[in-house]
């Protein structure tokens, strides 16, 4: 162990866990099990051996927390660990983790290889940085894996798979129309085999020590440290702050996904979120796991204006805002994926569920709608495979969900048949419109906008390779899909009636002549919800939303036909000289869905081809001259 060296110590502050600079010294605090012995281990930088071991005394103890203050402590000279009951313990509150610089590398059996580091005292130049403050009703959310997103992108000039590489993607996101990025776990976690006697890393499961890695990172982690192997430089703090600053300069917000398992202390989760918000200026969090208290986070003053996303929570515990546009809480909505995929593939009895999900937008919290995520098929694979193909995960294809609610359009896997390929392309266009024309927050899983595939693997948690990495060659191959998604995002943004701040009621409560939203079908003003029905018409009254210039939005009618035959929709009458004009048709291959030159108008009936979504917009027709009309 360490040589016998003396360092002056004092009783520290137990309220602040971890290693924190204080005056001219450093405060060390660690929580230990009852009746435990503990020491602080200090290492000289880049030294393989401990420099000194300083035992905590009973005088340092408050409850189960040992706290020690070392005056005149030079942070630049040292790294540290704790020793608890004879086992080396890397501080879960460490602001920097040393020894995990290369992703997936085994750390061996040396318990001193992984250790904690300190925050830098240098002031970072934020250059008048400001939170973009994207309200939920204007948010276009884009989720990605930091490493997998750029690892196979040949256009990246820097180190691929890093925060620095993501900076190069900002113009791409701006072109697509994205204004909020969500990062899958980007704090330090133990993706590969660990040293056998490192107590702090005991939660790595056995299967990740057998040649595979936990690529995603949904496990216990070091929640205060940016992941070192996601950095191109030796300065994780500066690199991550620079990434956030450049996002904000581009008007893009950043959401961090954080997973807290059952054994995690809810207070640790709270402190972690507060830290990332205050120190790194992160804009929000997608919180997962059983080790969190949603109520604790929702009622914290520091997080009161922070976007917080959960999969489940007690609605009555939400701290309500004065206006729907100010809401900060959101629910990730897997029900949307399940029901809308079933509607897309023409399952029975899905019309009522589809109508619910498309309109759902509560006043006190938002809903995040998506058709693909990391946990399941990609958008491309959803229309290419009926069954999971997870053999590469080395679990005999038993892992991953058996319920994918997918339809391969007649052939399992890639096909050269034109009819199959065209149907798949149409179904992907349909899926994106389902997400982008729903009232909730649309979420796109990175790469889906140009048909990225995982070859049917619906659980690529361990695939740090071409399966788990985004295939950027598909962007050129599927350029038309990218353009369609880009246009669909722009269409959503242009029409505020498609994303109002709060709930729509289905009544004309402002006496505008039409309800704010209404349901239709083969009969106007009537939705057929019988189990055999596979079509739905939704009309939005544009007078209930205003554009940035104060003008009323246009009324919009969306016809969903997922029958395998043509269907005739009866259109509601419009007042005055207005008629319906077709602006989007997912079956229009030549025009790539968007009908800019369309001149025909509709007033009574609309024929929609099989498995197609059509969007109509109310337009003013020229008034006929009365003298001419009398002839």
Where do the language-model regions lie?
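The feature marks proteins involved in alpha-glucan
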Residues: 1-25, 51-53, 60-143, 150-155
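An acidic-aromatic substrate-binding cleft motif
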Residues: 119-180, 184, 214-217, 222
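Aromatic- and acidic-residue-enriched carbohydrate-binding clefts of CAZyme catalytic domains
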Residues: 155-162, 193-249, 260-279, 392-413, ...
């Amino acid at each position: 162990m360490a040589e016998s060296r003396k360092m002056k110590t004092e009783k520290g502050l137990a309220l602040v866990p971890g290693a924190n600079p204080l005056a001219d010294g450093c405060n060390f605090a660690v929580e230990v099990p009852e009746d435990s012995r503990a020491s602080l281990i200090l290492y000289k930088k880049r030294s393989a051996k401990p420099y000194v071991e300083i035992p905590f005394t009973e005088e340092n103890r408050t409850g189960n927390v040992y706290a020690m203050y070392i005056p005149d402590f030079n942070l630049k000279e040292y790294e540290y660990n704790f020793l608890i009951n004879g086992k080396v313990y890397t501080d879960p509150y460490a602001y920097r983790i040393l020894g995990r610089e290369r992703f997936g590398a085994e750390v061996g059996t040396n318990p001193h290889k992984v250790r904690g580091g300190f925050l830098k005292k240098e002031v970072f130049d934020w250059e008048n940085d400001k939170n973009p403050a994207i309200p939920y009703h204007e948010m276009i959310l884009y989720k990605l894996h930091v490493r997998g997103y750029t690892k196979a992108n040949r256009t990246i000039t820097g180190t691929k798979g890093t925060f620095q590489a993501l900076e190069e993607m900002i113009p791409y996101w701006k072109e697509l129309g994205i204004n909020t990025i969500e990062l899958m776990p980007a704090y330090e976690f133990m993706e590969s085999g660990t040293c056998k006697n490192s107590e702090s890393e005991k939660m790595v499961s056995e299967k990740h020590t057998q040649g595979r890695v936990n690529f995603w990172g949904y496990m216990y982690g070091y929640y205060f440290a940016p992941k070192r192997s996601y950095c191109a430089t030796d300065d994780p703090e500066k690199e991550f702050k620079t990434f956030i600053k450049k996002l904000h300069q581009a008007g893009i917000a950043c959401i961090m996904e954080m997973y807290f398992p059952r054994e995690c202390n809810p207070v640790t989760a709270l402190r972690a979120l507060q830290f990332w918000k205050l120190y790194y200026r992160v804009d929000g969090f997608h919180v997962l796991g059983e080790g969190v208290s949603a109520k604790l986070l929702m009622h914290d003053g520091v997080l009161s204006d922070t976007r917080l996303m959960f999969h489940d929570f007690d609605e009555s515990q939400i701290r309500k805002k004065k206006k729907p546009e100010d809401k900060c809480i959101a629910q990730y909505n897997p029900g949307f994926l399940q029901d809308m995929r079933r509607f897309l593939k023409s399952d029975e009895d899905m019309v009522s569920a589809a109508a619910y999900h498309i309109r759902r937008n509560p006043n006190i919290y938002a809903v995040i709608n998506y058709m693909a995520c990391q946990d399941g098929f990609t958008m491309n694979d959803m229309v290419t495979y009926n069954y999971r193909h997870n053999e590469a995960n080395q679990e005999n294809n038993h892992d991953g969900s058996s319920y994918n609610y997918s339809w391969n359009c007649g052939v399992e896997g890639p096909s050269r048949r034109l009819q199959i390929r065209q149907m798949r392309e149409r179904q992907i266009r349909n899926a994106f419109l389902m997400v982008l024309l729903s009232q909730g927050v649309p979420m796109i899983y990175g790469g889906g906008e140009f048909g990225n595939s995982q070859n049917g693997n619906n659980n690529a948690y361990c695939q740090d390779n071409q399966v788990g990495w985004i295939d950027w060659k598909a962007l050129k191959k599927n350029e038309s899909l990218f353009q369609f998604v880009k246009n669909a995002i722009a269409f959503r943004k242009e029409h505020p009636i498609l994303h109002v701040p709060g709930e729509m009621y289905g009544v004309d409560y402002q006496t505008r002549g039409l309800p704010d939203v209404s349901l239709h079908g083969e009969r106007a003003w009537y939705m057929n919800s019988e189990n055999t029905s596979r079509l739905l018409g939704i009309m939005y009254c544009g007078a209930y939303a205003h554009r940035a210039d104060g003008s009323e939005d246009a009324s919009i009618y969306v016809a969903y036909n997922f029958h395998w035959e043509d269907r005739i929709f009866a259109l509601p009458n419009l007042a005055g000289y207005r008629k319906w004009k077709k602006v989007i048709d997912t079956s229009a291959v030549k025009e790539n869905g968007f009908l800019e030159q369309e001149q025909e108008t509709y007033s009574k009936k609309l024929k929609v081809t099989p498995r197609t979504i059509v969007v109509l917009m109310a337009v003013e027709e020229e008034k006929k001259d009365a003298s001419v009309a009398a002839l």
